[in-house]
């Protein structure tokens, strides 16, 4: 006759303090992202899954919890999804149903997403990658979902460029070049500035599911920096990227503002209470530190601020 093992996790803790998030990270699953009239995209996604833990319970039954989590994720990813945030939402709701001691379930997913495009000058076929970010939080009051992406681009420092332009202006004056010719030259030939590799992160969260097209969101993020970058670049493409970046030099702060403007202009149908998170981090080329800026705001606030320009 087998003896039932004690359920230590269900006992009371020595210190009766509740925990906001208990769960697992690094759970890898295949996710099929459906496309109408086309083959689905298969993503290798990494999940984080959490529930809250009441003060009267010692633990979250990690081994048993993992069975529930695995079953939940398998159910959520078994069918093709057209929106990755819905995968997280379905998983969070199922997780909440299966835990009688929790009031909140959170599921977060990241995956690398590949799109096809052409290089800007030579028009050669290439691919671009972005990191998809999706999450969902389920409570008895409902489920909120978030969708976003993290992309890489190029930025040029306006301050450094301004100093180069000033030096060029003085040199041309010493060569007796007329002022209007100098200004026309500097306008059409942006001067050198130190560059950075930029990382833009943009997410949109709302109750239910945000009406956001993932590809459009990625486009907004890529266009927020001085220039896009490409995996494949022939010499004409390198020239194009360098020129475009120096023609639109941006501080890290300017990139976040461009994200805000892009969201407002691209997604007019999003509700005012949608929460937009915008982050920009630049890997500095001439400093040992990096630059960072961010803004988290409701969409109605961003709409008001952008309309004031």
Curated annotation (Swiss-Prot):
It catalyses: GTP + H2O = 7,8-dihydroneopterin 2',3'-cyclic phosphate + formate + diphosphate + H(+). Binds 1 Fe(2+) ion per subunit. Pathway: Cofactor biosynthesis; 5,6,7,8-tetrahydromethanopterin biosynthesis. GO terms for biological process: tetrahydromethanopterin biosynthetic process. Its EC number is 3.5.4.39. InterPro entries: GTP_cyclohydrolase_FolE2/MptA, GTP_cyclohydrolase_MptA. It comes from the Archaea. Keywords: Hydrolase, Iron, Metal-binding. The keyword Hydrolase applies. Gene3D superfamilies: Urate Oxidase. The record marks 157 as: May be catalytically important. Pfam families: GCHY-1 (PF02649). The keyword Metal-binding applies. One of its GO terms (molecular function) is GTP cyclohydrolase I activity. Its cofactor is Fe(2+). Belongs to the GTP cyclohydrolase IV family. Converts GTP to 7,8-dihydro-D-neopterin 2',3'-cyclic phosphate, the first intermediate in the biosynthesis of coenzyme methanopterin. PANTHER family: GTP CYCLOHYDROLASE MPTA. Homodimer. NCBIfam families: GTP cyclohydrolase MptA. This is GTP cyclohydrolase MptA. It comes from Haloarcula marismortui (strain ATCC 43049 / DSM 3752 / JCM 8966 / VKM B-1809) (Halobacterium marismortui).
């Amino acid at each position: 006759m087998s003896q039932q093992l004690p359920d230590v996790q269900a006992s009371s803790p020595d210190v009766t303090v509740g925990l906001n998030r208990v769960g697992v990270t690094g759970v890898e699953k295949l996710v099929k992202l459906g496309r109408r009239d086309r083959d689905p995209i298969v993503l290798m996604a990494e999940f984080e899954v959490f529930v809250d833990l009441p003060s009267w319970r010692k633990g979250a039954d990690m081994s048993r919890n993992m069975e529930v989590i695995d079953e939940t994720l398998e159910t959520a990813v078994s069918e093709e999804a057209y929106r990755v945030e819905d995968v997280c939402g379905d998983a969070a709701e199922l997780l909440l149903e299966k835990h009688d001691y929790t009031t909140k379930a959170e599921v977060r997913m990241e995956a690398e997403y590949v799109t096809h495009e052409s290089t800007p000058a030579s028009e050669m076929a290439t691919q671009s990658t972005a990191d998809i970010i999706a999450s969902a939080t389920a409570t008895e009051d409902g489920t909120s979902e978030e969708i976003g992406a993290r992309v890489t681009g190029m930025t040029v420092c306006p301050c450094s460029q301004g100093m180069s332009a000033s030096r060029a202006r003085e040199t041309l004056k010493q060569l007796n070049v007329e002022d209007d010719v100098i200004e026309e030259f500097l306008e059409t030939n942006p001067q050198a500035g130190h560059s950075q590799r930029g990382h833009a992160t943009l997410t949109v969260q709302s109750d239910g599911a945000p009406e956001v097209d993932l590809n459009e969101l990625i486009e907004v993020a890529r266009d927020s920096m001085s220039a896009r970058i490409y995996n494949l670049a022939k010499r004409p493409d390198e020239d194009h990227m360098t020129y475009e970046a120096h023609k639109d030099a941006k501080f890290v702060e300017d990139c976040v503002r461009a994200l805000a403007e892009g969201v407002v202009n691209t997604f007019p149908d999003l509700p005012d209470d949608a929460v937009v998170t915008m982050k920009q981090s630049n890997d500095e080329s001439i400093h040992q530190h990096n630059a960072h800026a961010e803004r988290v705001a409701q969409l109605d606030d961003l709409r008001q601020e952008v309309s004031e320009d």
